[in-house]
Amino acid sequence: MLNQHTSSVPDDEHLQMAHQNSSSEVRNEAAVPDQLLTPLQPYTILLKDGETIATMYPIPAYPDLLPLGLLNFLLDEFNMEVEKGDSFPYYETLSLEEFKNVWFHNDGHVCIMVLGEIPELDYSMDTEADTNDNFGTEIETTKHTTQYKKRKERRNLNLSMQWEKQCLGIFDLKPAYPGRSAHVVTGTFLVNAGIRGKGIGKTLMETFIEWSKKLGFTSSFFPLIYGTNVGIRRILEGLNFRRIGKLPEAGILKGFDVPVDSFMYGKEFTHITKSIDLLRDPQKSIEIGKYERLKHFLETGKYPLHCDRNEKARLRVLSKTHSVLNGKLMTKGKEIIYDTDQQIQIALEIHLMEHLGINKVTSKIGEKYHWRGIKSTVSEVISRCQKCKMRYKDGTGVIIEQKRAVKQAHMLPTQHIETINNPRKSKKHDNALLGQAINFPQNIISSTLNDVEGEPTPPDTNIVQPTFQNATNSPATTAEANEANKRSEFLSSIQSTPLLDDEQSMNSFNRFVEEENSRKRRKYLDVASNGIVPHLTNNESQDHANPVNRDERDMNHSVPDLDRNDHTIMNDAMLSLEDNVMAALEMVQKEQQQKINHRGEDVTGQQIDLNNSEGNENSVTKIVNNESNTFTEHNSNIYY
């Protein structure tokens, strides 16, 4: 699995070759053996400025394959970090030989990142697929030009360059353990101190992962990452490296009175677990770094290294609400847990006590601990609980997705007349109507009762055209015909209206019901004023002029505009009205009968009876209007 082609070169031969190269004034390595070539290809990228091109060259881990000036520059950079005393475990600076032993492993590789392209550092094998091996980028390179190939074949390592401006960074790639654990890779990273903060470290780490996979490594392990090294920790956690463990007080660093903790990070290349991606979002690494710096500031009273003004101000503000108690970061009496593994462990322990639900476990955790996304962590833990899976199997619930408007049931109005316990007070009507007698034309009542006793109102599209049966001699024939024509036009306009959606259709239906109720109410008033009252007044005036023929006219033509069958309909209509209406009608009929019996009385007596009749009929007008309002209120009291 692991490509160990570099181990075929014996150490004696390697030392002999190094001795020969050191004794020659010109280091010409044109004839490089195939054992020193690598299957990895150079990787050219575009830096953040969008213009500068940089190339990372994979080189087999032999120091003699590098220019001497480049080795000296790398040694100076490494010793500079050693002198800082906050990243590497060395007390003293290293010599060139010690540096070679640390960085160059026989079974490993070294990556040199430089500006532009330097063909002398290209130790890759010539393959047919190398044109597509630039990680899918479309950056144009000079790798296939004649000049590049000539410089690669010549390989003059005595290059006079300013490596402090040309070299951007370096990392080594080697097995973490020998033999049976040689498939685990580790490495060391170093970025040019003059150009840090440009994203070069993250680019080197990403390339480290890609090349490790190509060389056959299955996992990566970094055993000693100091807690104060915030930069590398952000990069590792941002690339889904798992923090495997912590080694307390593992580093005695400069600027710290007490030893600091170190952390171990690891990542699987072939068996990536779900917990890394599901429980660690891009903001998680930022949160961890924030709490680590805050804890360091509270414990030591000193700002962490490489903190800008905004970071220092933020630490001062957070120090007022946070504290360290027995090595634990606290806020408002709760312990802050920013370690992902510890968060999962706490949620699992509380859940396993009684196998509680998400909300109860979240509440119990919130009593003692604090971290961002407690509910998400609890949800992930409960989803893995086998006992809860057996208790609550999938598919027991029903999930409804609202994709369109749900049609609602609506009640259609029915024209049944019911008694209202508390009828609404009748409104004031025109004074001209109060002084006139009222009688009901049976054709109008018949049409109304047919609507009352029928089925519920049909839909708009199936409305039956109404018909009116009027006597030819009725004084209200013309008015009713006009009313019927208006209603026919109104219904035809409704039928011709295009169908709307549910809500608009119900609004149109509501307006139709309101207009229909108001129309029926106006019909009662129009009939009372135009058809019945003039008829009665005309009869009364004729009776005064010719009292002899009045009996014969009343007996033969009691109501001229009604036929014989309408008397039965009139009686049925009277039975459905209120008792007070019946009493009023009986009183009117009694008064009329008295007038017929006393037709021989003098004119003064007849005038008094007529005034009494008109007064009673005025009361009937009020009662009928009140009942009409009650009927309208009943029809309008429909819920939608």
Curated annotation (Swiss-Prot):
Residues 1-30, 534-565 are annotated as: Disordered. Residues 121-259 form the N-acetyltransferase domain. Disruption phenotype: Decreases HTA1 RNA level. Pfam families: Acetyltransf_1, zf-H2C2. Required for normal transcription at a number of loci in yeast. Affects transcription at Ty1 elements, at PHO5, STE6 and ADH2. GO terms for biological process: DNA repair; negative regulation of autophagy; negative regulation of transcription by RNA polymerase II; rDNA heterochromatin formation; silent mating-type cassette heterochromatin formation; subtelomeric heterochromatin formation. Residues 549-565 have a biased composition (Basic and acidic residues). Changing residue 388 to S: Loss of complementation of the suppression phenotype. This is Protein SPT10. Present with 1500 molecules/cell in log phase SD medium. Gene3D superfamilies: 1.10.340.70, 3.40.630.30. GO terms for cellular component: chromosome, telomeric region; nucleus. One of its GO terms (molecular function) is promoter-specific chromatin binding. InterPro entries: Acyl_CoA_acyltransferase, GNAT_dom, Mito_N-acetyltransferase, Znf_H2C2_histone_UAS-bd. SUPFAM superfamilies: Acyl-CoA N-acyltransferases (Nat) (SSF55729).
